Amino acid sequence: MIDSKQKIAVLGAGSWGTALAALVARHDYPTILWGRDVRVIQSIDIQHQNFRYLPSIMLPQTLRATTDLAAAVSGADWVLVAVPSYAFTETLCRLAPLLSIGVGVAWATKGFEPGSGRFLHEVAREILGGDAPLAVVTGPSFAKEVTLGLPTAVTVHGEDACFTQMVANAMHGPMFRAYTGNDVIGAELGGAMKNVLAVAIGVADGMQLGMNARAGLITRGLNEMLRLSAVIGARPETLMGLAGLGDLVLTCTGDLSRNRRLGFALGRGQSLSDAIREIGQVVESVQTSDEVMRHAEQNGVELPISEAVRAVLREEITPYAGMKVLLAREQKPEYLDILFKANCSL
């Protein structure tokens, strides 16, 4: 039985934060959603819809929403952060003085801290201190499908097993499976890298390079995930699961993916600024490609696909030139034992 006193505060009223808040509210957890946009918050709290990010989808009437962060967090048993990566540090800095001792913080944000390239768990630990239970929620999950109640599976990773299980229990239900693990680095890496790789697949599809090219890029993209994971302390099985392969396949093939749509637009010849403006929401890959390559270069790992995406997003080369560079690479073994040969060249 759910503890009636267990209250969940969800921070971030975009599509993903709204979807997760609606999910746990439907599971009978007292849930309050915090956001900055007054109109969005009012539409959720009064009309039970997020007119901007999830239009025409009804939300639970029990879900409350507010622009008052202190009110949202007051009395919360744990907090779920679902803001874009560029707002993660600022949000935690505002949150920290409002948290009671022992209140855990989970996040469904994907990416790195902009500028520093730090993993988000490093940022959270620095801001929230060494005693706060932490966890990351990740996996193949489009917000719209979650809100519509379509079957979804994610994974929750954290060092505190009790808190990790608590987060998973709140999300787990008839149409939403929540697995658990303790590889925070691997979970975060997969969630960040898949956005970058999805741009490459989107470009290939926009250029009409065919299904063979799509499959090849996805597979070699997974190879890049595994190679980088091996030198930063992540476990390969995490990247072969929902946090890596699962999220990669969804983001690279699903038309709801903003990063795939960005790549598709670029592949069709659209400018970067026009493509981002047309999408109308944050596209994490634009910033994340720099941070992925920062980690690769610091660790001496070659990531040709990610590097090409970074160059395209910096507008240093055209999408066509990027594909030509990848296709012109010298022939070499596939390195099926890549899990154990972190420094092999792709």
Curated annotation (Swiss-Prot):
The active site is at K194. Keywords: Cytoplasm, Lipid biosynthesis, Lipid metabolism, NAD, NADP, Nucleotide-binding, Oxidoreductase, Phospholipid biosynthesis, Phospholipid metabolism. One of its GO terms (biological process) is glycerophospholipid biosynthetic process. One of its GO terms (cellular component) is cytosol. One of its GO terms (molecular function) is glycerol-3-phosphate dehydrogenase [NAD(P)+] activity. Its EC number is 1.1.1.94. The keyword Amino-acid biosynthesis does not apply. PROSITE patterns: NAD_G3PDH. It is found in: Cytoplasm. Its main location: cytoplasm. Pfam families: NAD_Gly3P_dh_C, NAD_Gly3P_dh_N. NADPH binds at S15, W16, R36, K110, A143, R258, V282, E284. Pathway: Membrane lipid metabolism; glycerophospholipid metabolism. Sn-glycerol 3-phosphate binds at K110, G139, S141, K194, D247, S257, R258, N259. It catalyses: sn-glycerol 3-phosphate + NAD(+) = dihydroxyacetone phosphate + NADH + H(+); sn-glycerol 3-phosphate + NADP(+) = dihydroxyacetone phosphate + NADPH + H(+). InterPro entries: 6-PGluconate_DH-like_C_sf (IPR008927), 6PGD_dom2 (IPR013328), G3P_DH_NAD-dep (IPR006168), G3P_DH_NAD-dep_C (IPR006109), G3P_DH_NAD-dep_N (IPR011128), NAD(P)-bd_dom_sf (IPR036291). Belongs to the NAD-dependent glycerol-3-phosphate dehydrogenase family. HAMAP family: NAD_Glyc3P_dehydrog (MF_00394). Catalyzes the reduction of the glycolytic intermediate dihydroxyacetone phosphate (DHAP) to sn-glycerol 3-phosphate (G3P), the key precursor for phospholipid synthesis. This is Glycerol-3-phosphate dehydrogenase [NAD(P)+].
